[in-house]
Amino acid sequence: MADKLDIKAFLDKDEQKDLLRLLTAGSVDDGKSTLIGRLLFDSKKLYEDQLDALERDSKRLGNAGEHIDYALLLDGLKAEREQGITIDVAYRYFSTNNRKFIIADTPGHEQYTRNMITGGSTANLAIILVDARMGVITQTRRHTFLVSLLGIKHVVLAVNKMDLVDFSEERFNEIVAEYKKFVAPLGIPDVTCIPLSALDGDNVVDKSERTPWYEGLSLLDFLETVHIDSDNNFSDFRFPVQYVLRPNLDFRGFCGKVASGIIRKGDKVMALPSGKVSHVKSIVTFDGELDYAFPPQSVTLTLEDEIDVSRGEMLVHPDNLPIVDRNFEAMLVWMDEEPMDINKSFFIKQTTNVSRTRIDSIKYKVDVNTMEHSSVPFLSLNEIARVVFTTAKELFFDPYRKNKSCGSFILIDPITNNTSAVGMIIDRVEKKDMNIADDFPVLNLPELGIAPEHYEAIEKAVKSLSEQGFEVRIEK
């Protein structure tokens, strides 16, 4: 019985640890996979069978000479092991006494930019590796730009292979100075630089005696203590409705994930786009009712009043509204093998909201290697650009830098259902700045002589058409 209680106590304690999601990025052969493998090895997070397999594979496939090739722990695809590179995003989970970790080992090659965007979309922190011999190179700048694009607030510059430059403090300081000069305009608030040797384990889990001049923490100590709670947006309440729960006539609740902000019982809320107002009656979960909820909790909200709210709509505080608009600018990463057709209409999915959208213009493409801007007629795979959109119906959004959950979206090809692109919203665009006429069909209800008491019924009919792919806008 005591053993069962001990197990339960351990699981309860483990459940309460906070979670740090991090990605690694770097050029080919900078040692990303080796670093993560070393982190798992030195923190005693490998099972006996994994260690046996690692030793066998190191002799047969390894690229580390007589050393164990820790990269083989993460390079799982046959093509990766044969080429000695990372292609897919490899995820690894481990935990320490203080924190749980999910590591995304992302590919360094430019042709796999979309894989890195996918791996970094949920990350709190990025580890960017550089080879101490090579210093800051083109790929370092590219990966740092992508990290800033994704809104990742914490970056560790891991200067690897310090053993090959005799753990030179002067060389380390040169690299740090060059990197900080580049990163300053990108607006990343927290940059930490650590000298290490992934192969030998210096400054990975424990402080190294070979860098007496380095006064900072080892990599694992830093990862365990970096403060990430303030990265969440707890001020702007946004609750995209995912599902309306109606198990019986006596209960009607709105299910979803709290995207940002805090909601409490009794709070006044507004439903968008209708603008109708009510108060929160209860916050329901599987484990019982809560007095308040915050991101990323999934809850069911019940309201004091019977107001019409459905999937794709949003509950917010009336005194703190998101931007409600059909026109906006965004940074777009093209992820489809097929090049962009600027005349094509797409589905846009933002939070739980889905609408038809068109691309009005490409302001400029960003060269991820040089940061130069250029004018282009379309985008190809892995290219990034600043793009202007118009949607068929209004979206409820915040700029991505302010609110990741409500400032991000995907474009879906209506024919193939492929995810064509991912986007990060910059801000709304005023209609006077739009250079293309609005060609979505419009129902102007006052002009048609329709009485206001019939508006709600017409809105429901139009919503039903929208779910079938027919977009019609209503003006009241």
From Swiss-Prot:
G5: annotated span: 197-199
Pathway: Sulfur metabolism; hydrogen sulfide biosynthesis; sulfite from sulfate: step 1/3
Catalytic function, reaction form: sulfate + ATP + H(+) = adenosine 5'-phosphosulfate + diphosphate
Gene Ontology biological process terms in this record: hydrogen sulfide biosynthetic process; sulfate assimilation
Record region (G3): 105-108
Region annotated G4, chain positions: 160-163
Keywords tagged on the record: ATP-binding, GTP-binding, Nucleotide-binding, Nucleotidyltransferase, Transferase
Family: Belongs to the TRAFAC class translation factor GTPase superfamily. Classic translation factor GTPase family. CysN/NodQ subfamily.
Gene: cysN
Residue span of region G2: 84-88
Name this polypeptide is given: Sulfate adenylyltransferase subunit 1
Superkingdom of origin organism: Bacteria
Residue positions binding GTP: 26-33, 105-109, 160-163
EC number of this enzyme: 2.7.7.4
Subunit structure: Heterodimer composed of CysD, the smaller subunit, and CysN.
Organism, scientific name: Bacteroides fragilis (strain YCH46)
Chain residue ranges for the region called G1: 26-33
Domain tr-type G: 17-232
Protein function: With CysD forms the ATP sulfurylase (ATPS) that catalyzes the adenylation of sulfate producing adenosine 5'-phosphosulfate (APS) and diphosphate, the first enzymatic step in sulfur assimilation pathway. APS synthesis involves the formation of a high-energy phosphoric-sulfuric acid anhydride bond driven by GTP hydrolysis by CysN coupled to ATP hydrolysis by CysD.
